[in-house]
Every structure is written in C-alpha cells, then in structure tokens.
Amino acid sequence: MGKQVRVLHVLGTTNLGGAESRIMDLYRHIDREKIQFDFLIHTTKEGFFDREIKQLGGNIYYLPSFRVYNYFAYKKACKAFFASHNEFQMVQGHMTSTASIYLPVAKKAGVPVTIAHARSAGVDKGLKGWITKFLRRNLHRKCDYMFSCSDLAASAVFGEKQYKEGKVVFVPNAVDTKDFAPDEHMREKIRREYGLENSFVIGHVGRFHYAKNHEFILDIFAEVLNQNKKAKLFLLGDGPRRQEMEEKAAELGIKESVIFAGNQNPVAPYYQAMDVFLFPSRFEGMPGTVVEAQAAGLPCLIADTITTQVKVTELVTFLSLAQDAELWAEQLNRIATERKMQKNTETEIDLSKTNYDVNYQVKQYEQFYLTGDVTVMKK
C-alpha cells in the first residue's frame, strides 16, 4: 500500500467526544512514519482536537452537515471531495448515519478499503432517529468491513443478522491504562483544587446529551446527599444540555454540592479525585469512560442498557433504569463501601493485557492499516 498509508477518519466533529477521544488515543500511539491519519468532518467550527491533529501531521477536511433535504448536495460534495483526493488507502467512517452515502462514493473514487465503524447502540429521538435508521438499513452492503465497539452497537447499526453471523469485527474502545493507574498524589492535588478533601465524591464523565441521562444523575445524587451531607457530584464534560442541568441542580437545592468541571484534557487525573463512578446512560456503544474508570480502580455503577462487554473487571455493577433514584443511591454507597474494604490492586494489570489497552490494540491496527488483512483485528 505504499510507504506511508493515509487513513481518512470520517466524523461529525473533532470535539471532545467518545469516538473522537478513542481515535486520538490511537493516533498518538500509532507509528506515524508508516501510517498517517486525516479527518473529514461535518462542521467548519474549530474542534477541541484540531490543533493536536495538525501537530501530529494530520489534515482536516470539511463536508456540509447532512440535513435530509440536502441529500443530493451532500452526495455531490462527497463526490467532489474524493475526486480531488486520491491519497487515501482507507476510509474509516465513524459517522454511520451517512456512511451509506460517503463510503460507496469513496469506493467508486478508487479508495481500496472502506470501513463502517459502529460507535453507538442508539439513535436520537423522533424524525432524526428514524432517518438515521433508514440510512443505515443496508450499510453492511456498502462497505468492505464492519467494525463495532460492542455487540449492542453492532446490532443497532448493522442489524442482528450481521452480528450473529460473525460478519462484524469487535474492536473495543481502548484506553492507555497506565495513564489511569491509581495515583494518591494526583488524588490529593485534584481534590484540594476543587475543595473535595473530606468529601465522598461521585464522578461522571460525559457530554451533556440526552443519551447520558444527566437529569437522573442529579436525582440520584439528591438522594445520596440526603444520606451523606459530605457527598459531592463531580461532572466532567460539556454539551447542549449543560445549562439545563445547572438549572435543575438549583431547583433540587443541590447546586452547592455539584461541580460542573467542563471539558478537561487530559481527563485521566480527574478520575483520581473520585470515590465511585456513576453512568446511568439511556444508550451507549461501548463507553470508554467506564473502561477508564476501571483502569483508575473505581467502582462503577452503570445502567443495564449498556453492553456487558464493558465489564472488564469486577469493579462494574449493573442496575436497571427502571429502579428509582433512591435504590441507585443505596447501591452507590454499597459499592463504594465494599471498594474501601477490598482494593483490587490488579485492575490496571488486567486491562493492560487485553485489547482494551491502546498499547495492545495499536499493534493490531498497524498490521491492518499496512496490509488490509482484517483477520489481524480478530486476534
């Protein structure tokens, strides 16, 4: 495939999201003398990772946002882009809502390998969600390979039949586990910085979006606070619903005990300040943040809507979203107490031996990108 393979990653944005963070982890670790990443995104707004991408040698290109009514204009823009760019050996589409449009265009333009990569097990509500499902309905026929971060994401994006027949390659959201290893010095530093020295800290990392269920997080925390006045809720992330959640915290009378810390990069040190990790999402693909929390040695209470594949240690407990906030609060206290009594010192070691660790996974990706042999991703 030539001296340096150029892989084009197609995304919505280059902001601090789950898929974007995982791709950047891979980008930082990959042999960039042999493999270089470029990015095709659907906004001209500057993204969180833009500067780093350019520093690492990548290019950022732009497509118009897809709005259904501009289907033909969108497809025309895709054709124009790939007609003027013949340098890519692979196109990896993480934005699967329109992958059935841009991947066939890329293939017809001469790109040797196209990949559709399922990153989420759900869709937005209403008309937008219906359109996404419609566009994905035959995506499996419009790409060379299908990758997925979990079983649930595979079924949601490519269909149950494709997953059950083993046609979808499982590629978990890997993290650099050594960055998250428990660090007492960093714990003290971050807790001191945010005034958490004597607090019971419940942490969450995620974009303020419908899927993340922040309103339920606040309800759960209100119950915890009734039982423990030293409790604090530590929320990392940003997004369209942040202001709404800040207002809800005020309405619940818990605003003084909730910290909206915004986006943080690197995020790893902030896990050290937490005592327990809360993640009651409505839907997910494979939440890398839960893998990160386990690498940091945190007990995790997560919704049973999330794939069991995310449980890579015994630190994860699942609970139904049908249960009320009071029961979630009780479970948080229980797992945090149990964790204090029995520290699992092997968490980081266990993760580092699997392809949930980016240092392990990058070797698979390098072989795949250089050879086009997808079987190396299945080892």
Give the residues covered by each predicted segment:
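Short His-centered aromatic/hydrophobic patch
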Residues: 93-101, 118
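Nucleotide-activated donor-binding/catalytic signature segment of Leloir-type glycosyltransferases, i.e.
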Residues: 246-262
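A conserved mid-protein helix/loop that constitutes part of the nucleotide-sugar donor-binding site
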Residues: 20-25, 200, 204-223, 240-246
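A short, active-site helix/loop in glycosyltransferases that binds the activated sugar's phosphate group
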Residues: 143-181
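Aromatic "clamp/platform" in nucleotide-sugar-dependent glycosyltransferases that forms part
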Residues: 263, 282
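A short helix/loop element that forms part of the nucleotide-sugar donor recognition site in Leloir-type
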Residues: 78, 181-195, 339
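N-terminal strand-loop element at the rim of the active site
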Residues: 3-5, 9-73, 167, 240-242, ...
